[in-house]
C-alpha cells in the first residue's frame, strides 16, 4: 500500500507487539505507537480518549470494534488526512457498516490478490495458508466520492 499511498506523522493506536509499527518505521514512516494494553511496545493509551490527531492514522484494529475505530479515527484526524485500516474483506458486509460507508466512504480499498497469513503475536507456526481475505481500507477525511478498488500483492 505504501507504494501508492503516502502517510505523514502516523498514529498506530492498536499497536499490540509493534509488528505493523516496526514495518512502517523500516519503510521510513514516522510512527507514534500506543495500545490500550501494555504489550511491550509503544505507549499505553485509550484511543477513544484522543480528541485530535494532526497526522494520519494506520492500524489493524480489534475486529469486534473495527467500526468504532473507523468512526473515531475520522473524528480525530484533520480534514484531508488519511485513515488506513487493515481489515478482513468481509468488513464491507453488514447493514450497520453500510450506513457507515454511506456517511464515510473509503477513498480506496486495496484488496490483497493473494491470501496473506496473519497470526496473533506473529507466530506463523502451523499456518501454511489463510482462509481469510484481507484489504487495506483507506479513508481521506472529507472525501465524498465513490470508493475505488485496487488490487495489491
Functional labels for PLM-detected ranges:
Residues 1-153:
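Class I S-adenosyl-L-methionine-dependent methyltransferase catalytic core
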Amino acid at each position: 500500500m505504501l507504494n501508492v499511498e503516502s502517510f505523514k506523522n502516523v498514529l498506530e493506536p492498536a499497536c499490540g507487539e509493534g509488528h505493523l509499527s516496526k514495518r512502517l518505521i523500516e519503510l521510513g514512516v514516522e510512527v507514534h505507537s500506543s495500545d490500550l494494553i501494555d504489550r511491550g511496545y509503544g505507549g499505553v493509551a485509550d484511543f477513544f480518549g484522543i480528541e485530535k490527531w494532526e497526522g494520519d492514522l494506520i492500524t489493524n484494529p480489534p475486529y469486534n470494534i473495527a467500526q468504532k475505530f473507523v468512526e473515531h479515527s475520522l473524528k480525530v484526524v484533520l480534514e484531508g488526512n488519511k485513515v488506513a485500516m487493515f481489515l478482513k474483506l468481509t468488513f464491507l458486509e453488514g447493514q450497520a457498516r453500510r450506513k457507515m460507508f454511506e456517511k464515510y466512504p473509503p477513498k480506496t480499498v486495496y484488496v490483497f490478490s493473494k491470501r496473506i497469513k496473519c497470526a496473533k503475536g506473529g507466530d506463523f507456526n502451523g499456518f501454511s495458508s489463510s482462509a481469510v481475505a484481507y484489504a487495506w481500507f483507506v479513508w481521506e477525511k472529507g472525501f465524498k466520492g465513490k470508493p475505488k478498488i485496487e488490487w495489491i500483492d
